[in-house]
């Protein structure tokens, strides 16, 4: 009696099942690769932001360094703090090597 209710599957059903499983796996792989791509892109933009901030800070530091080493600043500090002055020509003595 149990043979009456058993139907045989059409030919090619196993192949269709394999193709369906392959399709599902392919769809999951596409979704995962899209997710991973977005994660990497977010990480890239974050690193680019850090780089831009570091470059801006570097530019400010270079400008500050050039300000601190300017000749007019050094001369004014020497005159004001150390009371230095340019000697008169009569005060200059030549020393032989």
UniProtKB/Swiss-Prot annotation:
The chain crosses the membrane at residues 12-32. Residues 1-11 are cytoplasmic. It is found in: Cell inner membrane. Keywords: Cell cycle, Cell division, Cell inner membrane, Cell membrane, Membrane, Transmembrane, Transmembrane helix. Residues 33-97 are periplasmic. The keyword Membrane applies. GO terms for biological process: FtsZ-dependent cytokinesis. It is a single-pass type II membrane protein. Signal peptide: none annotated. Pfam families: FtsL (PF04999). InterPro entries: Cell_div_FtsL. Part of a complex composed of FtsB, FtsL and FtsQ. HAMAP family: FtsL. Essential cell division protein. May link together the upstream cell division proteins, which are predominantly cytoplasmic, with the downstream cell division proteins, which are predominantly periplasmic. Belongs to the FtsL family. This is Cell division protein FtsL. The gene is ftsL.
């Amino acid at each position: 009696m149990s043979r009456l209710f058993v139907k045989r599957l059409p030919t090619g059903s196993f192949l269709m099942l394999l193709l369906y499983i392959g399709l599902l796996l392919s769809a999951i792989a596409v979704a995962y690769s899209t997710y991973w791509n977005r994660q990497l892109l977010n990480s890239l933009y974050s690193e680019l932001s850090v780089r831009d901030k570091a470059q801006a800070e570097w530019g400010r530091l270079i400008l500050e360094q050039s300000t601190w080493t300017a000749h007019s600043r050094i001369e004014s500090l020497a005159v004001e703090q150390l009371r230095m002055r340019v000697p008169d020509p009569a005060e200059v003595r030549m020393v032989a090597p």
